[in-house]
C-alpha cells in the first residue's frame, strides 16, 4: 500500500515551514521530513554549494524527483523548499497527491517576519544580492502559484510556531477548499464537523460588533455561534429574519440597515450569516451594501447552502419580478460548512441539496455522479438522528468538498458571471421559472433537478447528447428522491420567465447544456419548436 504524507507544507523562505512542520509532526506523533535536508543527504553536499557548482536547473531536477518519490513513500509531515512548487512536474505531483486525499498547506506568514527570518544566517542562494528586494520579487512570483497549488491556506501572522501548528492540524483534520482568483480576495471554505469553531479566527481581531443574521429554525446553531462570538470578545447583535425566500426582500434588508445604523455599526464591524441559502444571500447583501462593504462570514446550515449559496460571492434579494434580480458580487472572508448542522435537517430539505451536488457532477466532476450512484439509497434515506459519526457523514463531506471545488473553479476566473461562471447555471433557466410560477413553494434543488432534465431533453433534441444521457439524468436524480417532471404551469408562462433569465441576450434565449458528461456549452437561441418540445417532455 502506498504511504503518503499526512500533510505537505509549502510557503515562502522564512515562513517557518520547517519549525511549524516539526511542531505539527510532534503533536501528531508522526515523522517529519524537510525536502532540502533530504536533498543534501542525497547529493552529499550543502544546497548553496550544489547551486554554485551545478546551477539552479540541475537542483530543481533533483528536487522534483525527490519530492515525487516522497509523495509516494513517506507517511508523515513533509515540508518543501520555497521554490519547489514553481516546477511544473512538482505541481502535477502535488495535484495528484491532492486527488488522492492529500493536504497541501500554504503557510502564509507576515512578509516582514518572513523576510527577517529568511535573512538570518545566510545560506539561501535565491536571496543573493539585496535580500529583501529579492524576497519581495520572489513573493510576487510565487504567491499566486502557492495559492493555486495548495488546498489548505493557513495565515500565521501573530502566531507562535505552536499556535501555527495547532491551526494547521485543525485545518488538515477538516476538508478545506481555497477560493481565489484575479478579482477575488482569497478565502477558505472549511468543511467538517465542528467547522464553526473557526468563526473567531476567520473574523479576526478587527471587528468590535458582529451582526448575527439568522432564521428562527436554526436557533440552536445561532445560540452556538453567539456563544463563540461572545467568548471571542465581540459585541453581538442578534438579528432574526423570516425563513427561506420570504426573508430575501428589500423590506427585510431595510429593517437590518436601520438596526445597524441605530446600533452604530461602522465599516470595521462585521456580519455573520447563518442558516440556509436565503439567509446567507441576504446577509451577504447587507454586508456588501452597509457602508459600501463590511467583512462577513457565511455559516451555512443546510446542504444546499453549503454547496451553493454560501460560496461564490453572489448576494441578493428577490423582487416581485423574479429571484435574485437585485444584488451584488461580494466575497466572504470565509465559509464554515459545519456538517454537525446537517443532523438537524428534515429528510426532504437534505435531499433537495443533492440537486446542486448532481449538477456539479454533470458539468465538471463525474466522480460526484459515481459517488451519488453508489450511495443513492443511503442518501435518499437520510436520517439526521443517525447521521453524525456515521460512514454517510464522510460521504457527504466528500460530496460537499468536490462540489465546492467545482464552484471554486468557475468562480475563480469569472466572479461576475460574464462567461465561465454561467456554466454553474446548468438546469437553472427552467428551474428559476418553476420556482417563480410555484411562488417559491418548490425548493431550489428540486426545481434545478427538473431544470437539468429539461436541459438534457433540449440538448438531445438539438443533437448534442444521446437518449441514454437523458435517461441517466432521470434515473440518477430519481434514485435520490429528486423530482424529474413538473406540471405546474403553461409553456407560455415558462417561456416569458425564461426570456427574463439573466443569461438571455436581448430577446434571444440562452441555455447551458451538456455535450457530454463533464463538459458544458452555451446554446444560443435554439429553435422554438425544440424549446417547447423539451417542455412537453418534462410534463410526462
From Swiss-Prot:
Swiss-Prot/TrEMBL keywords: Amino-acid biosynthesis, Aromatic amino acid biosynthesis, ATP-binding, Cytoplasm, Kinase, Lyase, Multifunctional enzyme, NAD, Nucleotide-binding, Transferase
Pathway membership, UniProt: Metabolic intermediate biosynthesis; chorismate biosynthesis; chorismate from D-erythrose 4-phosphate and phosphoenolpyruvate: step 2/7; Metabolic intermediate biosynthesis; chorismate biosynthesis; chorismate from D-erythrose 4-phosphate and phosphoenolpyruvate: step 5/7
Residue segments, region 3-dehydroquinate synthase: 167-540
Keyword set includes Transmembrane helix: no
Enzyme Commission code(s) on record: 2.7.1.71, 4.2.3.4
Cofactor: NAD(+); a divalent metal cation
Compartments, as annotated in UniProt: Cytoplasm
Residue segments, region Shikimate kinase: 1-166
Protein's recorded name: Bifunctional shikimate kinase/3-dehydroquinate synthase
Organism annotation: Bifidobacterium longum (strain NCC 2705)
